[in-house]
């Protein structure tokens, strides 16, 4: 379950036995959040995003950006400042990730990094956006990044006036 300052959602994931097809199912935990906005804007349920795997995410980002693909706004600098605390010994070049807005998730227990790098495009086909991921022995869904992305979407909703500080939502009750 993911809870932002104003809204929340419940997420469950299904994976094929070979791991090549993964389907997360998300449900709004209260009104006025990103799922409610999606349902209202597109008249019901649908596909939110499609993920593509790549072997070198920074190089993939550079190629896609050069071809004109627009990406979601990067998380604040504090996200990258906190990476060493959240994933000690991860070994990734933080400035390279930060300059591209690439998110990092996984675990580094027992000095054995299992990492997931990910980035998201702007909406590309109606409401659908693309996710680009690089797996370094991590088979998760970027649960730690899910919270960071959720918070960045919530900030965008505040900026657009969909959410308003001080107004109670179902998730904040």
Model-derived features: positions:
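Glyoxalase I/VOC metalloenzyme domain signal
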Residues: 3-173
């Amino acid at each position: 379950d993911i809870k932002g300052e104003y809204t929340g959602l419940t997420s469950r994931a299904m994976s094929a036995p070979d791991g090549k097809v993964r389907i997360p199912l998300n449900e709004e935990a209260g009104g006025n959040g990103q799922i409610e906005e999606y349902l209202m804007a597109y008249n019901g349920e649908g596909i939110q995003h499609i993920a593509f795997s790549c072997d070198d995410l920074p190089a993939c980002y550079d190629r896609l950006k050069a071809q004109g693909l627009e990406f979601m706004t990067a998380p604040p600098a504090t996200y990258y400042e906190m990476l060493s605390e959240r994933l000690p010994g991860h070994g990734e070049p933080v400035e390279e990730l930060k300059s591209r807005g690439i998110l990092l998730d996984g675990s580094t227990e027992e000095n054995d990094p299992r990492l997931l790098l990910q980035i998201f495009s702007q909406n590309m086909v109606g409401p659908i956006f693309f996710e680009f991921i690089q797996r370094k022995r991590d088979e998760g869904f970027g649960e730690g990044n899910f919270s960071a992305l959720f918070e960045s979407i919530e900030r965008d909703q505040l900026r657009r006036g969909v959410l308003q500080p001080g107004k109670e939502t179902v998730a904040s009750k």
